UniProtKB/Swiss-Prot annotation:
It is found in: Secreted. Belongs to the somatotropin/prolactin family. Gene3D superfamilies: 1.20.1250.10. Keywords: Disulfide bond, Hormone, Secreted, Signal. It holds the Pfam family Hormone_1. This is Prolactin-1. It comes from Oncorhynchus keta (Chum salmon). Residues 1-23 form the signal peptide. GO terms for molecular function: hormone activity; prolactin receptor binding; superoxide-generating NADPH oxidase activator activity. The lineage of its organism: Eukaryota, Metazoa, Chordata, Craniata, Vertebrata. One of its GO terms (biological process) is positive regulation of gene expression. PANTHER family: PROLACTIN (PTHR11417:SF5), SOMATOTROPIN,PROLACTIN (PTHR11417). Disulfide bonds join C69-C184, C201-C211.
Length: 211
């Protein structure tokens, strides 16, 4: 019941965001999006740390390299200095592109979390995955509104294919692949958060070095 109440409140907040965002300025929209992306990255970091505490040493050796993340082919700025050189339209398109790429993987993580092996706090993990989905949806809705305000040059978007339909058959593979996907998401949520913070700085005319 508590979970349903929390989900209802967030859903209502999203509806209010969608309705009210059409009437407010771009800088305020940037601020709201930045707050949501910050929460998204904070949640993914917390969840990754939870998994780390239950991850066997051998699993770290067996876990795929970051270059195996399904979004690794997307060319993005590597740091803040590079992001500051990218146009506003391109940055918001990259943020939306990355966010959209995680719709299916987050569904997979949500379905696997309740029966994840070797993790006594499955309920907490499942709850945080659902929160990630909620905040991802909320942020995506906000970015769509921002794009409409910024013009047609920001509106093209396609999805990055995700081919991982399952996490494996044995317990070790499932845990390793779950942890790997979460590590990839944490990396991408950091990128999204960084891009939106740069956009927020530009919208409020802050000096680049303070972004």
């Amino acid at each position: 019941m508590a979970r349903r109440s929390q989900g209802t409140k967030l859903h209502l907040a999203v509806l209010c965001l969608v309705v009210s965002c059409h009437a407010i300025g771009l800088s305020d929209l940037m601020e709201r999006a930045s707050q949501r992306s910050d929460k998204l990255h904070s949640l993914s970091t917390s969840l990754t740390k939870d998994l780390d505490s239950h991850f066997p040493p051998m699993g770290r050796v067996m876990m795929p390299r970051p270059s195996m993340c399904h979004t690794s082919s997307l060319q993005t700025p590597k740091d803040k200095e590079q992001a500051l050189k990218v146009s506003e339209n391109e940055l918001i398109s990259l943020a939306r592109y990355l966010l959209l790429a995680w719709n299916d993987p987050l569904l997979l993580l949500s379905s696997e979390a309740p029966t994840l092996p070797h993790t006594p706090s499955n309920g907490d993990i499942s709850s945080k995955i659902r929160e990630l989905q909620d905040y991802s949806k909320s942020l995506g809705d906000g970015l769509d509104i921002m794009v409409n305000k910024m013009g047609p040059s920001s509106q093209y978007i396609s999805s990055i294919p995700f081919k991982g339909g399952d996490l494996g058959n044995d317990k070790t593979s499932r845990l390793i692949n779950f942890h790997f996907l979460m590590s990839c998401f944490r990396r991408d949520s950091h990128k999204i958060d960084s891009f939106l913070k740069v956009l927020r700085c530009r919208a409020t005319n802050m000096r680049p070095e303070t972004c």
